[in-house]
Amino acid sequence: MSEIKIVDKFINPRDHEELQTVMLQREFPWTVAQKTGDMDRDGKSKDPLNTQLNHWFADYRNIHYSPFFKYVLPIVNEQRIIAISRIKANLQLCTENPIKSDYHVDLSLMYGINEIPEPHITNIVYYVNSNNGYTEFETGEKVESVANRAVIFPNTLRHRGVSQTDTHYRAVINLNLCLSAATPPEFPGG
C-alpha cells in the first residue's frame, strides 16, 4: 500500500460533525446519477442498482462551486493545493448484498483514441459516515468506510466503491486535486 495513505481523524471532529450534519439534512441538494460502468444509448445505466446520489461541491470544467463549498474547506485546507479539479459527494443507499462498482480512475485524458489517467491528480476519498462498505483497489487493498477517515492515492490507481449493507446510507466525498510536488502534504495524525 505504498502509494495509498490512510489517515484517521483527518479533520477536526467539530468540522467533521458539522459537515456530516449539513450533508444529511433534508435541505441538502442531491442529484441522481450512475456510479460507474456501461450505459445504454440514452445515457442510462444498464444496471438499475448502479445508482447513487451526487452533490458537486466544485467542478473546474463547469466553473461551478456549490453554496455548501465552505463545509469541505477543512478537508481542502489539509493539503497544499495548486488547483482543484473537482470535489463531489456520493451517497449510496443500503443494498441487501454488497454491490461493487466498476474499477475506474476518476479523471482521464484522451490520447488519440485511448483514455489515459490524468497523471498529475491526487485523489482523496473522505468518509462521512462509518459503515461496512469500502473502497477497493484493483491491486487488492481495501479501505473500510470509517467516519472522518481519508484515503489518499494517485489518480492512476484504479479503484471502486462497494456498497454497504448495515446502514441506511454510505456517504463519501471524492476530491481530485493537483497538489504541490515541491512541498509534499503534511498529514494530520502522522
Regions found by a protein language model. Give the residues of each.
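Non-heme Fe(II)/2-oxoglutarate
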Residues: 1-82
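Fe(II)/2-oxoglutarate
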Residues: 1-2, 188-190
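A short glycine-rich, His/Asp/Glu-containing loop-to-beta-strand
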Residues: 81-101
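A short beta-strand-loop-beta hairpin characteristic of the jelly-roll/cupin
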Residues: 98-103, 109-112, 119-122, 127-146, ...
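Short beta-strand His + acidic residue motifs that chelate non-heme Fe in jelly-roll/DSBH
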Residues: 103, 158-166
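A short hydrophobic beta-strand segment most commonly corresponding to one strand
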Residues: 123-126, 167-183
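Conserved metal-binding segment of the jelly-roll/cupin
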Residues: 143-159
